[in-house]
C-alpha cells in the first residue's frame, strides 16, 4: 500500500497557551517540530468563538510552514474571507456549534447543498482545495461529488467511541465510494494509536488527521516522540 499522510492538528497547543493568555507555547515552533517528526501537513480549526486558534495564528503558520496548511472552518462568510486572505493549501468545511466541546459529526451535505455551493466555488476560484467533513455515508458523498470538492474527510468518531465492525464497514464502503467517484479520501476524529492503525489499513484512505490524542501523548512523551510514533504506526500498520 502507498504511504499514508499524517496531518497533525495543533488546536490544543493553542488551548494550553490561551489558558494563561501567554505567548507560549509557540504554535509555529510546535508545528515545525511536528513536521520534523513526520507530520505531512498541519491542521488548525479557526472557530467562530476563537476558543483556541486565533486569526493571527493562521497567518503565521501559513507564512512559516514548509508543508501544506489545512484550515478547518465553518461555512460562513467571515471565515470564507479569512481563508481567501490566508490562502491555505486546503480548506476543510466542518459543522460548528458554539456549545460543543469538539466537532460532533459531519456536514449534512444533502440538506446544505445549495448553501455550500458558493463557498466551494469561491474557494476554488482562489485556487484553494476544498474538503468536506462528512459521516461515512454514501448519500452524503454523492452530494459532495456534485459539488466537485477535492477531498472528503470521513468522521471516524463513532468508530473510535464504539469500535464496532459495522461502523468500520461503513468507513470501508465510504472510502471505496470516494475512490470510485475520484474523490480523495481522508479520515479523522478521535483517533489514537490503535484506531489509527486500523483506519490506516482501509484501502483508498490517503491521509489521517489527528490532534487531541497526540497533544495528550505529548504531555507524557514529548510532541516529537508522539508524532514520530504515530507516523510509524500508520505507515506500518500491523
From Swiss-Prot:
Q: Does the keyword Hydrolase apply?
A: no
**Which residues bind 3-amino-2-oxopropyl phosphate per the record?**
9, 20, 190, 211-212
The residues listed in the UniProt record as binding 1-deoxy-D-xylulose 5-phosphate, with positions renumbered to this chain, are 11-12, 47, 52, 102
| Keywords carried by this UniProt record | Cytoplasm, Pyridoxine biosynthesis, Transferase
Q: In which pathway does it act?
A: Cofactor biosynthesis; pyridoxine 5'-phosphate biosynthesis; pyridoxine 5'-phosphate from D-erythrose 4-phosphate: step 5/5
Indicate the family of this protein: Belongs to the PNP synthase family.
Q: Which HAMAP family does the entry link to?
A: PdxJ
How is this protein named in the record?
Answer: Pyridoxine 5'-phosphate synthase
Organism annotation: Ehrlichia ruminantium (strain Gardel)
Q: Which gene encodes it?
A: pdxJ
Amino acid at each position: 500500500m502507498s504511504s499514508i499522510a499524517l496531518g497533525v492538528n495543533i488546536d490544543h497547543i493553542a488551548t494550553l497557551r490561551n489558558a494563561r493568555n501567554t505567548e507560549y507555547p509557540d504554535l509555529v515552533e510546535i508545528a515545525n517540530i511536528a513536521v520534523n517528526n513526520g507530520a505531512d501537513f498541519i491542521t488548525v480549526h479557526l472557530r467562530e468563538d476563537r476558543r483556541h486558534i486565533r486569526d493571527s495564528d493562521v497567518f503565521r503558520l501559513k507564512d512559516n510552514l514548509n508543508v501544506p496548511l489545512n484550515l478547518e472552518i465553518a461555512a460562513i462568510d467571515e471565515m470564507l474571507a479569512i481563508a481567501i486572505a490566508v490562502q491555505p493549501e486546503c480548506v476543510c468545511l466542518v459543522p460548528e456549534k458554539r456549545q460543543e466541546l469538539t466537532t460532533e459529526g459531519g456536514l449534512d451535505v444533502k440538506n446544505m447543498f445549495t448553501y455550500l455551493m458558493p463557498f466551494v466555488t469561491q474557494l476554488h476560484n482562489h485556487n484553494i482545495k476544498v474538503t468536506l467533513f462528512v459521516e461515512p455515508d454514501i448519500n452524503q458523498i454523492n452530494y459532495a461529488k456534485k459539488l466537485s470538492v477535492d477531498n472528503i474527510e470521513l468522521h471516524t468518531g463513532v468508530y473510535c467511541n464504539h469500535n464496532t465492525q459495522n461502523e468500520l464497514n461503513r468507513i470501508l464502503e465510504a472510502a471505496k465510494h470516494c475512490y470510485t467517484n475520484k474523490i480523495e479520501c481522508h479520515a479523522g476524529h478521535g483517533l489514537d494509536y490503535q484506531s489509527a492503525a486500523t483506519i490506516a489499513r482501509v484501502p483508498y484512505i490517503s491521509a489521517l488527521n489527528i490532534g487531541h490524542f497526540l497533544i495528550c501523548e505529548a504531555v507524557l512523551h514529548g510532541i516529537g516522540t508522539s508524532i514520530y510514533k504515530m507516523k510509524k504506526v500508520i505507515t506500518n500498520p500491523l
